[in-house]
Amino acid sequence: MDDNKRPLYLPFAGPAILEAPLINKGSAFTDEERIFFNLEGLLPHVIETIEEQASRAYDQYKNFTNDLDKHIYLRNIQDTNETLYYRLVQNHITEMMPIIYTPTVGMACERFSKDYRRNRGLFISYPNKDRIDDILNNSTRQKVKIIVVTDGERILGLGDQGIGGMGIPIGKLSLYTSCGGISPAYTLPITLDVGTDNPHLLEDPMYMGWRNPRIGGEEYTEFVEAFMQAVHRRWPDALIQFEDFAQKNAMPLLERYKDQYCCFNDDIQGTAAVTVGSLLAACKAAGTQLCQQRITFLGAGSAGCGIAEAIVAQMVSEGIAESQARKQVFMVDRWGMLQSNMPNLLPFQQKLAQDCDDITNWDNFSENISLLDVVNNAKPTILIGVSGAPGLFSEEIIKAMHSHCERPIVFPLSNPTSRVEATPKDILHWTKGQALVATGSPFEPVVVDDITYEIAQCNNSYIFPGIGLGVLAAGAERVSDAMLMASSRALAECSPLSINGEGSLLPQLEDIHKVSKHIAFAVAKVAIEEGHALPTSDELLSQAIEDNFWTAEYRRYKRTSF
């Protein structure tokens, strides 16, 4: 029986119901419910449907003139009536996605302490390191199945935001529900408050976090370890998503925990999965395979290298040797292209550094090879930006790339929009409409020579909700590399451009539920094949996905005796 059709029995009544966002219906409580739950007189006389409530809320939403105010308004609805919030967002998903998440959520993080209104999620501060179990038990969410956790050190392209980073887990989990059908009752945002090195926050009298420089080293490692163990004790089957950890911690934490717990890092693995999925769709539209491409990255941090490793894995699966695949991937950071003789390369960068012997015949060969030099010598067919540095995909670089590649694939993925390496408008004009473009933040369509080009947003929201749904439906105990690769291929299968030869590189957000279910099935199938979940038939797996898919509809309430 569908949960939305089954009555929910509540052991409390009166104003407490109206203060519980997971339960509150506002003006939609029926006459019978108002009598049984002592709500008569606490609400206006008229009984409304959820659509009538959503219509009023949307009218109010449209009265706000700036995006941050719209974000705050929607968060207020979320904190009072979550079912209405998700119905409203789902009714206007394309319009509201940039408001509830990037780019607007970045501003909300910067102003988190100043605009703080109501508690949501858990804040686990380092001074309370010995009481983590008690803190987890204080959560109002008892059946947690998905956790998004951050320490606030690398929030989007904005750097250290301390506890202001809580806006990211809240926003990410909103997308798990809006896009992936995960019940909000199963979600929990968590911020690990380990201090901040942001002097503006330390000096701000309104800052609500632990006013202390960030801990590091062994103290930090032991604190995160205590957190992970406590979460596993409290919710042993929960999926944990690491979010916006600094480069120095992101990869080590992922390597430490990915084989111990059901977890993944969205900045590294989610970004890689959606990028590979988008590239597979772009390659199909261009009539090629990924293994035939030469790829240049601007940005060689954990996110960029994570994408590069996923690309290498996909190229190998298409039939070329790993050594050859690595020769076709060129990583550029602030010091130039990564080369094997460079000192101080991080472990995850070393495998992606080019062998100096292979590039000695390049023009302008030196210790510091610029992005333009890489474009002129390596002649890449794909250019990916994850640098967080705006404007570095210059007209000279894009035109140099286009001179040797008829249909260049250009992905300036940095967030927010103020950090993008080049705008889609510039890229398409510089290439006379020939480039295949996807961005990390939303952009309006671009018109070149009377042709309108839809700009795909290479947003992780196409991937992680489906991964979460697949993990829940299958009961998977791990998130493996093969499961992530399956999500990429499933996303590519949904591309309008690769299917029809026209339209956007990625599906419309209005189709996100269908896309998430398709990805969930692919992810769950691989989880079963690898032994991370119990075997089941395709039919039962599809049914499990449907059964786990929550919709924003009010349930009937019955009162228990008390």
UniProtKB/Swiss-Prot annotation:
Transmembrane regions: none
A Gene Ontology cellular-component term: cytosol
Cofactor requirement: Mg(2+); Mn(2+)
Signal peptide segment: none
Cofactor note as given: Divalent metal cations. Prefers magnesium or manganese.
GO molecular function list: malate dehydrogenase (decarboxylating) (NAD+) activity; metal ion binding; NAD binding; oxaloacetate decarboxylase activity
Residues reported to bind a divalent metal cation: 243-244, 267
Reaction catalyzed: (S)-malate + NAD(+) = pyruvate + CO2 + NADH; oxaloacetate + H(+) = pyruvate + CO2
Active site: 101 (proton donor), 172 (proton acceptor)
Binding site for NAD(+): 154, 267, 415
EC number: 1.1.1.38
Pfam families: malic, Malic_M
Single GO BP term: malate metabolic process
Keywords of this entry: Metal-binding, NAD, Oxidoreductase
Site (Important for activity): 267
Family: Belongs to the malic enzymes family.
Quaternary structure (record): Homotetramer.
HAMAP family: NAD_malic_enz
NCBIfam families: PRK13529.1
Listed name of the protein: NAD-dependent malic enzyme
